[in-house]
Amino acid sequence: MAAPWISKVKASGKLAVFVSDAVKRGAWANAFTQAFAEFNRLAAGGKFGVTLTLASSPPDPDGLGGADVNFDVGDGRTTFKAMGQEFSVNVLGSQMHGHTQVVGFGDGNGKVTEVIKSFVFVPAAPTINSGPAGNQIVRPVGDAIRTFIAVHEFIHCAGLSNSDHSPGNVPDVFLGQPQPVSGAKPQDDKMLLFLGNPNIFAPPITVSSRTTGVIQGLWPQQP
């Protein structure tokens, strides 16, 4: 279930994102830049009530300071510290989706009721099968799929959980299980969101009124 951010962050209408060196200097650099801009474009058009900014320092491991969101790559068991506690997540480095771990106040039953910090891990080297049947190779995915993955995780950062994923009949970037489709070249790779007549692919990246409504319910509209 979706959860709002703490009041200080919610009132600002901004999420400050710290980007790791592994992202800035690696294969995710271009996709991160594109996804950052794409989320803000969608946020402006849909009046989400929240936009992304860049932070110069990571989240304080022992308190409320630093960035709100940490964006990093993951491959295997990855650990981090927040609010004085150690956390770990397991990210398969070749998979086609990321993982967003929120840290926040809870209800005592494992449910987060207010988000304090958010940690995004995208797969270090997502791969796709490409080529004609019987002669396929496994290669890195193109930036379009990486960008899709990152925008999806940014929506999680806004406060949405897996239970808020878009259903199959409302295909958008927050779909739970989009299907990767390889192109003749990595730059032609895309995500299949809906198999029908016609098929619906991303790019372009879109957000439905359903997803927009959930986000708006968590963030006060800025003047």
Q: Which residue ranges define each predicted feature?
A:
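Short helix/strand-capping connector loops at secondary-structure junctions
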Residues: A184-F201
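Disordered inhibitory propeptide/activation segment of secreted metzincin zinc metalloprotease zymogens
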Residues: M1-A27, F36, R41, L92-K111, ...
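Hydrophobic beta-strand segments of well-ordered beta-sheets in folded domains
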Residues: A11-F18, D68-N70, S118, D189-M191
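Metzincin-family zinc-dependent endopeptidase catalytic domain
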Residues: A29-P180
